[in-house]
Structure formats: structure tokens, C-alpha cells
């Protein structure tokens, strides 16, 4: 059966700002409390989506969450009208307001883990929204993430939704950013690789500088929930030194597509053992495209997000890399990519660069912005039954006009305390749900 790998990208929200919230995210820390440009950020993300759609790839769109999250501030003791709550939080707890205003839901690689129907015992697509307990500003996303995914993938004949795991560090789950899949072709059964940084129950090496986010126990639970076919799941440990260098998720240093694993050798605790285990689990040859310190240092790989590129199969079965423009500007990263595409021994034939500087300054590259979902033709038809989330020229034009209408060009840290920003954001999201055919999605839209 024909199948497509659809990339569902998160739209950048109107409150995109540099709050410096993410522990272990070096770019986020370096950009903390500087001015952002939400309009530019959203347009950059949309242009990336448009480029992939123009290449003939299946490209979807997921909406941002409502921010500032006034309902969360109420749970934390702030009272009064919405405007009063925002002003008070800005005065007495500005860090809390920044967290509740974060547009981090744009990085939908952390939204969920998705297993395609070819990999599961019941032949259905399984989705588990990530609980993200390691960072407060992300831990509040799971309920709306679940609602969005259930709206988009609503047909119970094809899709199974699991609740987020219990929200604690024992089951810390960061979604698809720590999950990869290898397969002969997208529609065929594959091997799912779950990458963890720590274990709550086993004594394993740990990073020293930054905390590991994904637990082995969470990865094992998601694999069980998804009913992955026996022997077709692997659990691999991140390199502790990589986490300390700023690779807070596996997708900062590795990306897989079909029969290719493109990665930095520091990504895993033992890269040789990892390759051996993958080779044993797969019934088809795997192209391991690996680099190390001699070609691209770990620090440069993290700075440029070289391996947070998207690795894509084009119509015609050639592969291409969509890398952040920071890689083009880096001598070592650019040279490595040029050598990869010139090597006829691997399927990667092209590289393109994309400007995502607004997202990159917050520590999110091309792969952070997308959730990969392999869909058969009937599954894709089911997605399009009740919503308008697959990008075409008309939807692109509508979204571009929507962004230009509603988004500010500059947002400073103090602007987060402006109650007008909440009203602007709600007006934007209210219109967006109409554009996407969602109906009422957000709390403010309900009586």
C-alpha cells in the first residue's frame, strides 16, 4: 500500500519570545531577554513548509497553543480579570509570566511519539502526546497537544490516541525528538529506535552539567502502548557528554530516514555498539553516515544544528537534507554536507539551506519544528475529512495573510506584561481555527 511521510509543522505563536527558559539549551540561554520578531518567526516557519510542499512532499500544519496561559496563572494563585492577572504576574513573577507566554509548542517534534500502522500489532497509527515534565513551560502543553492531535487524527478506524504518561521525571517523555525509525520504505514495517538519557531504576552514566530529559522507563512505556511488533524496537542511550554540550534531545545530533542514519558519533554512549544493534535488528542494509570531532566538533554540531536538519525522501526516491542556514555559514558543517552529497555510496543527493534564525535563536532547528507521521492513502484521506491541515497554495496564502494581519514585528520582555497581547493572540487563534476548519479548540472559545 502506498504511504507518505507527512511532516506536520507547528505554527509559531504570536507570543514568540526569548525567555531563556530551557535548561541545557545553549542557544536559548544566549538569547535570553532579547527582543524577538514573532511575525518573522512565523513566516520563516511557513516558508519552510511551503518549500517542502513545492518539492512534492506531504506537508501538514498544527496550530499554536493559547498564550499567555492565563488559566495556568490562575492555578498558581493569581486572581482577578485576565488583564489584572497578566499585569500582576509581570510585576511580581516575570519569570513565571515568561514561562506561561512561551511559544514553545511550535517545536512539535516534542509534541508526541507516533508509530505508523506498518509497525504496530493492530495495524493502526498510535500517538502518545509527550508529558514534557523536565521544563515547566513545556509541561503545561500536554492537554492541548492531545486535543489538537485528536482533532487532526480523529478517525478511530485508523488512529489510536494514548494519554500522556504520568507527569513526573520517572516517566519523563520528550516525544519524537528522542525517537527515530528505520525502514526499507516509509510504508513498510520498520525498526523504531527510542533514545533515552537517564533511567530512574538503573545505574547508568549520567551527564554532569545539564540534566538528561528522556527516561528509559518512559520510552519503554510508549513502546508498549504502541504495540510495536516484537523485536522491532530498540532502546539506545544518549551520550552523556553530548547532553552536557547542549544536545538536550537526540534530534540535535541525529536524524534517520528510511535506510539512512545521519549522526554525530557523540550522539550515543557507544556509537559502535549502537550501529551493531541497529544492523542486527534491521533486515535490510543501513547507510550509517557518521562524523566525529575530526570533521565537525561536537560544539560546532550543536551550534549549527547540523544534525537537526530534515532528511527527506523526494518523489523519485532521492534523498535531500534541509539544513539551517547556520550550516552554510560554517566551514566545517558545509564541507561535511558537501562531501555527503558527493558520495555516490549513499542515497543523499541534495542539500538545501533554510533561514530559521528566529527559531534557531531559541534552540530549535528544522527538525524541531516538525512531527513526522507516516500515513497510508486511506489514513491521509481520513485526516483531510474534517480539517484543513495539509498545506496547498490556497492554505499557504491564507496563513501568510493571517500572520501578517495578527503578528507583531517586535516583542520585548516587558511587552509580555501588556494585556493587549493576550487579546491579539486570542483574536489570531480564533481566526486560525476557522481557517483550519477546527471549530472551537481553545478554552476562550467556549462559553
From Swiss-Prot:
It is an enzyme of class 3 (hydrolase). The active site is at 174, 249, 368 (nucleophile). Keywords: Arginine metabolism, Hydrolase. Its EC number is 3.5.3.23. One of its GO terms (biological process) is arginine catabolic process to glutamate. InterPro entries: AstB_sf, SuccinylArg_d-Hdrlase_AstB. Substrate binds at residues 19-28, 110, 137-138, 213, 251, 362. One of its GO terms (molecular function) is N-succinylarginine dihydrolase activity. Disulfide bonds: none annotated. It holds the Pfam family AstB. Pathway: Amino-acid degradation; L-arginine degradation via AST pathway; L-glutamate and succinate from L-arginine: step 2/5. Coiled coil: none annotated. It comes from the Bacteria. Gene3D superfamilies: Succinylarginine dihydrolase. Homodimer. Belongs to the succinylarginine dihydrolase family. Catalyzes the hydrolysis of N(2)-succinylarginine into N(2)-succinylornithine, ammonia and CO(2). This is N-succinylarginine dihydrolase.
Amino acid at each position: 500500500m502506498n504511504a507518505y511521510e507527512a511532516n506536520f509543522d507547528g505554527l509559531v505563536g504570536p507570543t514568540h519570545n526569548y525567555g531563556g527558559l530551557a535548561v541545557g539549551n545553549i542557544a536559548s540561554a544566549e538569547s535570553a531577554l532579547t527582543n524577538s520578531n514573532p511575525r518573522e518567526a512565523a513566516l520563516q516557519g511557513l516558508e519552510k513548509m511551503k518549500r517542502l510542499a513545492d518539492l512534492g512532499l506531504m506537508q501538514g500544519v498544527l496550530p499554536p497553543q493559547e498564550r499567555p496561559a492565563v488559566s495556568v496563572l490562575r492555578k498558581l494563585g493569581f486572581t482577578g480579570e485576565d488583564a489584572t492577572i497578566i499585569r500582576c504576574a509581570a510585576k511580581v513573577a516575570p519569570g513565571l509570566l515568561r514561562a506561561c507566554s512561551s511559544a514553545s509548542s511550535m517545536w512539535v517534534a516534542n509534541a508526541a511519539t507516533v508509530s505508523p500502522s506498518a509497525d504496530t500489532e493492530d495495524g493502526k497509527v498510535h500517538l502518545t502526546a509527550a508529558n514534557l515534565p523536565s521544563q515547566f513551560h513545556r509541561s503545561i502543553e500536554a492537554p492541548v497537544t492531545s486535543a489538537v492531535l485528536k482533532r487532526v487524527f480523529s478517525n478511530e478506524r485508523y488512529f489510536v490516541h494514548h494519554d500522556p504518561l504520568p507527569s513526573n521525571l520517572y516517566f519523563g517523555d520528550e516525544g519524537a525528538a528522542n525517537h527515530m525509525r528505520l525502514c526499507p520504505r516509509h510504508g513498510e514495517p520498520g525498526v523504531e529506535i527510542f533514545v533515552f538519557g537517564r533511567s530512574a531504576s538503573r545505574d547508568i552514566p549520567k551527564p554532569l552539567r545539564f540534566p538528561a530529559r528522556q527516561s528509559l522507563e518512559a520510552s519503554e512505556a510508549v513502546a508498549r502502548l504502541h504495540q510495536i511488533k516484537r523485536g522491532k524496537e530498540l532502546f539506545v542511550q544518549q551520550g552523556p557528554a553530548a547532553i552536557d554540550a547542549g544536545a538536550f534531545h537526540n534530534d540535535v545530533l541525529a536524524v534517520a530516514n528510511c535506510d539512512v542514519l545521519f549522526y554525530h558519533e557523540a550522539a550515543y554512549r557507544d556509537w559502535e555498539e549502537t550501529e551493531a544493534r541497529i544492523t542486527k535488528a534491521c533486515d535490510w542494509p543501513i547507510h550509517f553516515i557518521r562524523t566525529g570531532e575530526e570533521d565537525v566538533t561536537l560544539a560546532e554540531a550543536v551550534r549549527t544544528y547540523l544534525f537537526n536538519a530534515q532528511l527527506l525522501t523526494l518523489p523519485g526516491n532521492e534523498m535531500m537534507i534541509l539544513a539551517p542556514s547556520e550550516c552554510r555559514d560554517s566551514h566545517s558543517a558545509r564541507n561535511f554536507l558537501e562531501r555527503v552529497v558527493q558520495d555516490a555510496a549513499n542515497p543523499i543527493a541534495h542539500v538545501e539551506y533554510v533561514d530559521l534564525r528566529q527559531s534557531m535563536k531559541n534552540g530549535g532547528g528544522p527538525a524541531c519544528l516538525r512531527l513526522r507521521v507516516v500515513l497510508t492513502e486511506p489514513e491521509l484521506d481520513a485526516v483531510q475529512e474534517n480539517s484543513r491541515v495539509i498545506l496547498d497554495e490556497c492554505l499557504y496564502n491564507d496563513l501568510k495573510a493571517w500572520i501578517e494581519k495578527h503578528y507583531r514585528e517586535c516583542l520585548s520582555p516587558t511587552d509580555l506584561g501588556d494585556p493587549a497581547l493576550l487579546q491579539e493572540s486570542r483574536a489570531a487563534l480564533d481566526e486560525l481555527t476557522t481557517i483550519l476548519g477546527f471549530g472551537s479548540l481553545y478554552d476562550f472559545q467556549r462559553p
